[in-house]
Each structure stands twice: as structure tokens, then as C-alpha cells.
């Protein structure tokens, strides 16, 4: 149980983060090294893995970080559970763009975990999520957009949702989504599950 005053405080923090998100075109075609970060749980332990992958060769290296997680799962506040561990797992990894398992600005306060991490690290991030958290789906020119209060905040390709975190734009998300679910996130997911079992 999380006290109401703490959630209200965290909402204010999220609004502050959202005001500091920079939406600008990055250019997926310019990315030579891409990072992905994911997390798995066993009890109250979180197993986070950051993967850095060379786009051309497919070669990758990774870092893992294990830590205790005491904040409960509350939709819209995922960053409190996962961001600290994810940031530790990607420290020192070499990449141009970070993909985060979670939402960017396709979030009720436009401050999903990919936006939080992107702003805190001042780094280009895209959120890739498995389910919709907020907004309405609208099909336009063969692309499914996520609209929030009349604004396009994300896109859906297959069963995945892509939204800008920081220093990227919707076109970057579209270009990424057209390529299918990112391999670097598949690797991160596989490694979190493997490390959790060890």
C-alpha cells in the first residue's frame, strides 16, 4: 500500500519530467549501436539487463544488475520499480539509442519509464511496450497511432506500442516499429530470464 500523498508527489515529479522531454528527430538510420534494457523478477528481487548491440554485425555485449525492489506495481508508476535498476544495468554501455521495455510519452502524464530514463540521462530513448496504458487507437494511412488528448503520442505495430522517450520523435518510432520487435530487446528479455534462474 502506497500512501496517497506519495503518489501525488510522484505525479508532480512526472509532470516535471514531461516538461523536460525533448521531442526531436533522431534518424534511426544513423544508429550504429543500439541498447535495450529489460527486467525480470523473482520475489522482491529485480534482475535488470542492459544490452549494447552493433546494428550491422549483430554482435552484442551486456551488463546485469540485481537489486531489491520494494515499490509495488502501480500502473503509471512503473519507473519507481524499474528505473533505478535499469539505469544501473546500462551504465557504461556504448550506444546511440536506448530502447526501454515500457512506455515513453504514451502515458497519462506523458512520463513513462522511457521518458524518465531519457530525461535523467539526457539520452535518446524510445519506449517499447507490450500493452497500451492510455490513449485511443486511430488508424491513419495504414499506421495505428495512439492519441492522448488529441495529440499523437505513440504508434502500434503488431502487438507492440512504440512511443518517444526523449530526444526522438514519432517518425523515429514509426521507422523502428516497421522493422519488427527489436532484436536487442529480445536478447535483453532472454538474458533477464536466464540470469533470474541462475
UniProtKB/Swiss-Prot annotation:
Membrane-traversing stretches: none
Major location (coarse): cytoplasm
Cellular component annotations (GO), alphabetically ordered: cytoplasm
Binding of Mg(2+), residues: 38, 101
Family matches, as Pfam families: Endonuclease_5 (PF04493)
Cofactor requirement: Mg(2+)
Marked site: Interaction with target DNA: 73
Catalytic activity field: Endonucleolytic cleavage at apurinic or apyrimidinic sites to products with a 5'-phosphate
Subcellular location as annotated: Cytoplasm
Class of the enzyme per the UniProt entry, highest EC level: hydrolase
GO terms for MF: deoxyribonuclease V activity; magnesium ion binding; RNA endonuclease activity, producing 5'-phosphomonoesters; single-stranded RNA binding
Keywords assigned by UniProt, alphabetized: Cytoplasm, DNA damage, DNA repair, Endonuclease, Hydrolase, Magnesium, Metal-binding, Nuclease
GO BP, one annotated term: DNA repair
Enzyme nomenclature, EC number: 3.1.21.7
Known role: DNA repair enzyme involved in the repair of deaminated bases. Selectively cleaves double-stranded DNA at the second phosphodiester bond 3' to a deoxyinosine leaving behind the intact lesion on the nicked DNA.
Family affiliation: Belongs to the endonuclease V family.
Protein name: Endonuclease V
Species: Saccharolobus solfataricus (strain ATCC 35092 / DSM 1617 / JCM 11322 / P2) (Sulfolobus solfataricus)
Gene symbol of the encoding locus: nfi
